Amino acid sequence: MKISILGAGAWGTALALQISRRHQVSLWTRNQAHIVDMQVTRANLQYLGDFAFGDQLAVEGDLGRALDGADLIVSVVPTNGFRNALKEIKRLGCDAPVVWASKGLEAATAKLPHEVAQDELGDSRHWGVLSGPSFAAELVRGLPTAVTLAANDAEFAARAGAMLHGGNFRVYTSTDVIGVSVGGALKNVLAIAAGISDGMQCGNNARAALITRGIAEMTRFGVALGGAKETFMGLTGAGDLILTCTGQYSRNREVGLRLANGQTLQEILKTLGHVAEGVHTAREVVKRAGQLGVEMPITQEVDQVLSHGRSPRQAMENLLSREQKSEAL
């Protein structure tokens, strides 16, 4: 089988390396200099280090060639580039099913990736989302990783999951596309909050409180959109949130840490080297939550820090001074 992976960042490349152990893989990016570098070195030195590409992994700069003969497309482009990627897939006449690993909400529309897929591909085409607690640096080293593939069709979810599953990479399946998408988007925003807390030396108790109240926030938002409550206690909810709020490779947590240490957002993004989806997602989540009438105090404070000049200390004080209430969702 041939699997086409769109996006040659750390996670796209880690997936390409993992999947190419069992299938032919075409890894595409539009950055010509990056393509040449990967073709010459047979590694992604820019984003992932010197993990060597095998014979079944081809690097492509031409999207048409990358998609030619594909049995499955896996899009790992940032959320704000996802719609354009789908438009290009349609323009080239490729009818292979699409799975994406983007985690966020589209800027301006505040749409989740599955809503973008509905806009561009419709419901008749098979598509799904791959998400869960997964750092590229660990997967590529052969460390055990478990994720969930949720799709608009249960049979397709099982089939696509079987294509990606193997060895140290466990792929569970689901049909709760909404819940899985929300978990992936919200955990990035909440990880910024956890980073701020850690950067301010608020301690382990505070981090645990942010994570658990973050799960409540994530669940309220997801259920209001039509997701299943139990999804948020699984890999793509609690699992991904815990990892992203505590792990050393978390870009979103790093943003929070550096904000707490006095750096401006512009300084952080200039030197981060990778996309931190939570930065762009917070504003869109607040917008969508307002439309739904869902209370999201942690996300709102993160948005205030990122986009409205509120200090991390003031944001933390605002959360601590909230009225006492029941722990219920």
From Swiss-Prot:
Pathway: Membrane lipid metabolism; glycerophospholipid metabolism. Pfam families: NAD_Gly3P_dh_C, NAD_Gly3P_dh_N. Keywords: Cytoplasm, Lipid biosynthesis, Lipid metabolism, NAD, NADP, Nucleotide-binding, Oxidoreductase, Phospholipid biosynthesis, Phospholipid metabolism. NADPH binds at W11, R30, K103, A136, R251, V275, E277. It comes from the Bacteria. Its main location: cytoplasm. GO terms for cellular component: cytosol. This is Glycerol-3-phosphate dehydrogenase [NAD(P)+].
